[in-house]
């Protein structure tokens, strides 16, 4: 949340007596938080560059905007853990509570902390201390494997359409040395709405079509409101996290593995290509992974430069997420089809570098394209969070969202993606118009033309060197006329001046394609003492 969002929030508070009381409590607690040894001002500003750039007081930002958005005040305090341990309501600020009452009462700061009170001098282990514990954990799993026992792995999934490690899961499920399962976890960030249960059920239904019932571990909220410790209940050895963000209950976030016998691995959801990704790479959670798998030498070099561990826990295996694309040969059919893929960040993000979306600017044009180009088919595939965000009262609301969808689909050459894997749609499409982050590189795997939407040339500074190289192979659009020229000249007329250059460049980003998952599995297997060999057969 940036400074503008913070001011908007304060204005909304001022119009609501209850909100005004909450804002006053936040202002009152500012000094308490600012003086706390657990509030790390420099760390907070470094983790959230938009706050530093805005000049907003970091303690005030944490109280009014940061805590409601799930941000922590420092590397040694996890608000979600403290709130769960001590029964705090969602409205209570965890750090303010600890300094006003919890410290005196001996409240525990973390599940890692020994029972029996706060214990002055206790602190959260550093990433280096956490990494130093991995050899002992690895030795325990190696011993288990040497006895002929299967290595148990859990893949956390919050959205079936955002499951980058799925090819690695499938590779493990083909390998008799592993017992790999899925645990569908709640996304508690509130991006897609308040109640996580409907999204969990949709995710379960989608994955149940591809996996047997025993592959899906049961995850349900208890009558006390708590979520189960899936890793301990299953006896997991490995856990694959879907994100370096703390998107779910604390038992499903990377931090939960500290001090516990699990080996956490991570497969990137998006091919790292933006300035915002540097902020993610520098995060504490990335330093908690045993193995972080990267796509190519360029992204690994960025991680080594930015990460706390200077890349010591990372290696290049290729872009695991894109392996399945090779199973869908191009089959465009008799008519050319164009994908329309807008990003969700209509309100910005944790950093302005994530504010990629141009949808509100081009919504009318997108709705009219099927009528303007009847010789083309259009498939609308928005980011999964776009319409949940637009449904909020501050944007369109549900009725306007439904009306826009009906307007777009009123033409016979318009269709709406049902979500899930993008690979069949990528293979069956001839071009894309988009402003998404991950699709910038992923579409390159198809070799087909891309029209990338930018607000202005200053938007180019949101991209890291690799992202800028990708954009050089895209047809850039700064206005609606450029979008229509792309459809008319490149898609219909076939005058694609970037085709040869794009084909040569995409080979440099497609490392180990389509066997990146096999490379990741080989890395894990080697660390666990498995004999090297070819990928497991289906």
Segments and roles (model prediction):
Residues 2-122:
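Charge-rich, low-complexity intrinsically disordered regions
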Residues 18-25, 110-152, 534-538:
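Non-catalytic membrane-proximal stalk/linker segments that position and tether the catalytic domains
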Residues 121-139, 268, 281-355, 361, ...:
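A nucleotide-sugar donor-handling region in carbohydrate enzymes
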Residues 121-129, 480-538:
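C-terminal amphipathic helix plus adjacent low-complexity
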Residues 154-324:
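Active-site and donor-binding regions of nucleotide-sugar-utilizing enzymes
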Residues 164, 168-179, 320-403, 477, ...:
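Conserved catalytic-core segment of nucleotide-activated headgroup transferases in glycan assembly
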Residues 394-418:
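Nucleotide-activated donor-binding/catalytic signature segment of Leloir-type glycosyltransferases, i.e.
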Residues 418-462:
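A donor-sugar binding/catalytic signature common to diverse glycosyltransferases
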């Amino acid at each position: 949340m940036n400074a503008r969002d913070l001011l908007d929030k304060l204005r909304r508070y001022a119009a609501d007596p209850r909100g005004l009381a909450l804002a006053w409590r936040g202002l009152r607690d500012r000094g308490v938080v600012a003086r706390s040894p657990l509030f790390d001002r420099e760390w907070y500003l470094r983790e959230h560059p938009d706050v530093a750039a805005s000049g907003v007081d970091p303690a005030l930002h944490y109280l009014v905007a940061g805590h409601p958005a799930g941000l922590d005040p420092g590397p040694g305090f996890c608000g979600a853990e403290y709130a769960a341990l001590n029964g705090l309501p969602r409205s209570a600020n965890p750090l303010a509570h600890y300094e006003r009452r919890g410290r005196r009462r001996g409240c525990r700061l973390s599940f890692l902390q020994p029972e029996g009170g706060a214990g002055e001098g206790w602190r959260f282990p550093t990433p280096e201390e956490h990494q130093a514990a991995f050899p002992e954990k690895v030795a325990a799993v190696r011993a288990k494997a040497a006895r002929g026992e299967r290595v148990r792995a859990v893949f956390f999934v919050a959205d079936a359409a955002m499951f980058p490690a799925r090819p690695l899961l499938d590779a493990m499920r083909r390998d008799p040395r592993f017992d790999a399962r899925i645990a569908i976890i709640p996304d508690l960030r509130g991006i897609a709405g308040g109640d996580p249960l409907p999204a969990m059920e949709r995710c379960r239904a989608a994955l149940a079509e591809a996996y047997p019932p025993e592959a899906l571990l049961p995850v349900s909220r208890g009558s006390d409101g708590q979520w189960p410790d899936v890793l301990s209940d299953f006896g997991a050895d490995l856990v694959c996290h879907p994100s370096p963000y703390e998107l779910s209950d604390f038992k499903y976030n990377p931090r939960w593995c500290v001090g516990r016998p699990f080996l956490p691995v991570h497969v990137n959801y998006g091919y790292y290509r933006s300035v915002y990704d540097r902020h993610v790479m520098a995060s504490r959670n990335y330093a908690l992974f045993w193995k972080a798998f990267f796509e190519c030498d360029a992204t690994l070099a960025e991680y080594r430069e930015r990460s706390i561990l200077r890349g010591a826990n990372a290696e290049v295996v290729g872009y695991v997420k894109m392996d399945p694309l090779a199973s869908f040969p191009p089959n465009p059919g008799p008519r050319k089809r164009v994908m329309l893929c807008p990003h969700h960040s209509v309100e910005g993000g944790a950093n302005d570098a994530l504010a990629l979306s141009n949808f509100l600017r081009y919504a009318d044009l997108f709705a009219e394209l099927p009528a303007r180009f009847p010789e083309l088919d259009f498939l609308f595939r928005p980011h999964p969070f776009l319409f949940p965000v637009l449904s909020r009262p501050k944007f369109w609301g549900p009725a306007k969202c439904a009306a826009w969808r009906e307007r777009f689909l009123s033409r016979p050459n318009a269709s709406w993606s049902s979500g899930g894997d993008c690979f069949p749609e990528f293979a069956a499409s001839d071009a894309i118009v988009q402003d998404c982050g991950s699709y910038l590189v992923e579409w390159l795997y198809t070799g087909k033309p891309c029209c990338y939407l930018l607000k202005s040339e200053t938007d180019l500074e949101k991209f890291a060197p690799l992202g800028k190289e990708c954009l050089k192979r895209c047809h850039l659009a700064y206005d609606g006329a450029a979008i229509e020229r792309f459809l008319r000249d490149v898609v219909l007329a076939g005058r694609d001046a970037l085709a040869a250059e794009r084909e040569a460049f995409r080979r440099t980003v497609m490392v180990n394609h389509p066997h990146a998952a096999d490379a990741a599995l080989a890395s894990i297997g080697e660390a666990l003492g498995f004999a090297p060999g070819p990928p497991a057969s289906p």
